[in-house]
Amino acid sequence: MARVKRGVVARARHKKILKQAKGYYGARSRVYRVAFQAVIKAGQYAYRDRRQRKRQFRQLWIARINAAARQNGLSYSRFIDGLKKASIEIDRKILADIAVFDKVAFAALVEKAKSALA
């Protein structure tokens, strides 16, 4: 039986990992063994943070809506409750955008929420 030499396969695998580790600091971008660990860890962080990003953006939107609602004399929870009672269905992403870029429209939404609560 012929001897199987795997130099080509190993070289390709190493090149692939080192390409993924491009831009990393020091040995992490040059030494295969270290680069492999760095790439694996980076993948774990990326996987985790893709899920965290959704939570963090929702937190940001809620903080912005709360700040804008309080400037108009209403807490976040009462504002959201008022919108639901007024059957206004705008998601938090759009509400936060309106709160930042169109203060007049947001004030009108707060007034509708207040009237629905009363």
UniProtKB/Swiss-Prot annotation:
GO cellular component: ribonucleoprotein complex; ribosome
Keyword RNA-binding part of the UniProt annotation: yes
InterPro entries assigned to the protein according to its UniProt record, in alphabetical order: Ribosomal_bL20, RIBOSOMAL_L20_CS, Ribosomal_protein_bL20_C
GO BP: ribosomal large subunit assembly; translation
Keyword RNA-binding: yes
GO MF, any single term: rRNA binding
Gene3D superfamilies reported in the protein's UniProt record: 6.10.160.10, Ribosomal protein L20
Pfam hit, one: Ribosomal_L20
SUPFAM superfamilies noted in UniProt: Ribosomal protein L20
Domain of life: Bacteria
Keyword line: Ribonucleoprotein, Ribosomal protein, RNA-binding, rRNA-binding
Described function: Binds directly to 23S ribosomal RNA and is necessary for the in vitro assembly process of the 50S ribosomal subunit. It is not involved in the protein synthesizing functions of that subunit.
Family note: Belongs to the bacterial ribosomal protein bL20 family.
PANTHER family: 39S RIBOSOMAL PROTEIN L20
Protein name: Large ribosomal subunit protein bL20
Source species of the chain: Photorhabdus laumondii subsp. laumondii (strain DSM 15139 / CIP 105565 / TT01)
